[in-house]
Amino acid sequence: GPPRSSLHNSLNSFAFYAVNLAGREQQALPQSPFQPYQVSFAAPTAKHVWIVMADSLRSDRLGVMGYQRDTTPFLSRLRDDGELLVRQGIAAGVSTAVSLPVFLNLIREPGQNHLLREQPHNLFRLGREQGFNTFWLSSQESKLLTFAGKRFIDVSITREDFPLLFSQRQDHALSDLLPRKQWGERNLVMINLRTAHSPYDHNYENHDEPIARWPTDGPLSRDVREGNAYDNAVRYFDDVVADIVAQFDQLEGERYLLITGDHGQLLGENEVWGHNRLLPPVVDVPVMVLARDAPQGALDDLAGQRWVSHYEAGLWLAQRLGARVVNPNADPAVHFVKGKLLLGDNSIMQVKESGEGLQFSEPMLLSKWLQGPAQRTLPAPDQPADPG
């Protein structure tokens, strides 16, 4: 469609503020018991650190992660060739507006809104301080930048900047735009894909290559039709990633590409669709890493884990930038997922690793959690702090 007017964008921003932000800081939350994270720096060796974050990407619908349909032929080929590390991930939140800033600001424990405002260990901030040029390329709207660290981003491109290109090419617009970037000596690049956001077929229906594999018309039930459309959108995502990796492989020097989803998706379980709910299918995301010209052991911190949370992935990315973030509050077997609100008295859920799998606690209001249970998540005084 036509570019949106400044009035439209102003109203959009005001509506976002009115719905999500206004008055929330006046809701006095109990003080959080958490100690500040410590950051130390060393000279980075990586030349390029790329992050691909796809919308609504649920790992158990990816062929590369065992799904019976071949929804990810390119990624599966990388894995089969021993080039791609693949792990089940744990999302930071159940909506894009929550998960993305919590991930980028390396926040583990809920109730620390000052870390969203001050951004002491935001990935873009760490990257810029370490001499990286910083890029944000998104097929979504610019309002997602609100708490993402936009003041530390050198080049930002969103859907509003190239409306015609994005309407015609969808996520492939980003791979079209990548060659135009003038890379510096070191580059931190965030690529934010729309991917499998509903309505799923809108993400791939204009694509001129034959990738849609499963039928979405005819006498199909909603479950079958929507499920097929979702799988087709994932298949389209795989095609976009293939283009991104082709350009990543043209670069030189030590480089890393991490792929994840902002959150998962409900696909008809108990007749519920979408996300925004603290339920296991919405927490379920992939974490996949491609390394080139990397030193031995660069992936060990991730490869040794069965599950990788967004927070843990962020710590690993920070290390690629030469920044080591130590969290004295961390328990490596306990993770937190934030509900659909970024600020205020949001619902949260604790996820605990066990030998049998992930254990999901009942969602709880942040205010109630801070009044008691939060204290019990802290390491014992004689227990050494986990570096992650």
Segments from the language model and where they lie:
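Membrane-interface soluble catalytic domains
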Residues: G1, R125, S142, A246-Q250, ...
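Active-site-proximal alpha/beta segments of enzymes that process anionic O-linked groups
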Residues: G1-I51, S56-W214, D284, H310-G339
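Hydrophobic alpha-helical segments with strong N-terminal bias
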Residues: Q35-V39, R222, N270
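Metal-dependent active-site segment of extracytoplasmic phospho-/sulfohydrolases and closely related
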Residues: W50-I51, A233-H275, G314-L321
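Short acidic, glycine/proline-rich loop/turn micro-motifs
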Residues: L62, L104-R108, G227, E269-V272, ...
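Histidine-centered active-site microenvironments of extracellular/periplasmic hydrolases
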Residues: G66, D70, D249-P295, D345-N346
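Active-site-proximal cap/lid insertion segments
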Residues: K143-T146, R194-D243, Q247-L251, N276-D284, ...
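Short acidic/glycine-rich loop or secondary-structure boundary segments that cap or lie
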Residues: S198-Y200, L267, Q296-A298
